[in-house]
Regions:
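Hydrophobic/aromatic beta-strand patches that form the interior of the parallel beta-sheet core
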Residues: 9, 40, 88-90, 169-171, ...
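Conserved beta-sheet core of the metallophosphoesterase superfamily
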Residues: 140-236
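Short acidic low-complexity segments
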Residues: 120-140
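A short C-terminal boundary segment appended to hydrolase-like catalytic domains
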Residues: 225-255
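Mobile, glycine- and charge-enriched loop segments
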Residues: 1-21, 138-139, 176
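Short His-Asn-centered micro-motif
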Residues: 11-12, 42, 90-92, 133, ...
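Acidic carboxylate-rich catalytic motifs and surrounding loops in phosphoryl-/glycosyl-chemistry enzymes
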Residues: 88-94, 129-133, 234-239
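Core catalytic region of metal-dependent phosphoesterases/phosphodiesterases
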Residues: 11-124
């Protein structure tokens, strides 16, 4: 039987323009060197605070920065995906803000193709496939953003709860926490099934996220390796200086 291996790098929440610029550079350099088969961004690639319901009728609602934030997001996505054959993105609550505000305020604008998220973020030009439903990232695993379910403050448990609800192992973002957990289903001394939940952290500049003061967040990303029927998910934690270790080799330039 022919042995095949597929490696996918999973990028956590970026929320441009609040992304950690040095970490983005380090991740892009790692992807260029590591040469995975695919890159997946797990959602919230852009923050879109200007059209958030929290900013409605507040000064932020009138800021003329949307175009600059969009262009920055497109540049970041290009940096992270230019060296792979496949690039993917899953739907998320922050990216949904564009659709939500149009539907609430000016629903007729939904007929304009340039306001669809795929066009707005130039995903077609970048070669990024957009998944509105859970993405089957590997055998027995799906990737979701993670905003459509109850959250647990313990890293990995929100993802595990999603996996138990969906009946498959789950890798997700949204919580900005990095961790994993698992549950086994056994009967009469035999393990029938093991479900995993993995949360991939974040890649934000926490100082720029002024809406939190002492968040329980961790910077990280993940590597999903599929080898025929076997799947290995490695959670890679980022050091305080923005560097990280992958399979015994250190990557990135320190801040």
């Amino acid at each position: 039987m022919r042995m095949t291996i597929k490696r996918t790098v999973v990028i956590p929440d970026l929320q441009c323009p609040y992304e950690d610029a040095q970490l983005v550079k380090n991740l892009a350099a790692f992807i260029k060197s590591f040469r995975p088969d695919a890159v997946l961004t797990i959602g919230d690639e852009i923050d879109l605070p200007q059209i958030s319901r929290w900013h409605e009728n507040q000064p932020g609602w009138y800021e003329q920065t949307l175009a600059a934030d969009r262009d920055r997001t497109v540049d970041v996505l290009w940096e992270l995906t230019q060296h792979v054959r496949e690039a993917h993105m899953v739907r998320s609550n922050h990216c949904d803000r564009l659709y939500n505000v149009i539907m609430k305020k000016i629903p007729a604008f939904m007929s304009l193709p340039e306001l669809k998220l795929e066009k707005f973020l130039k995903l077609d030009e970048l070669g990024i496939k957009y998944w509105k439903e859970p993405m089957p990232i590997a055998k027995g695993w799906v990737a979701i953003h993670g905003d459509l379910g109850a959250l647990n403050p313990n890293p990995g448990m929100s993802a595990l709860n999603q996996s138990k609800r969906m009946g498959v192992s789950v890798i997700m973002g949204h919580t900005h926490r990095a961790g994993r957990s698992a549950v086994s289903e056994a009967y009469n001394g035999s393990v029938r099934r093991v479900l995993h939940g993995v949360e991939v952290g974040h890649a934000m500049n926490v100082k720029a996220a002024k809406y939190v003061s002492s968040p329980n967040w961790q910077q990280a990303f993940a590597i999903v390796t599929e080898h025929n029927k076997n799947v290995q998910v490695d959670l890679i934690y980022v050091e305080k200086d923005g560097t990280f270790l992958v399979y015994g080799k250190r990557y990135g330039r320190a801040r």
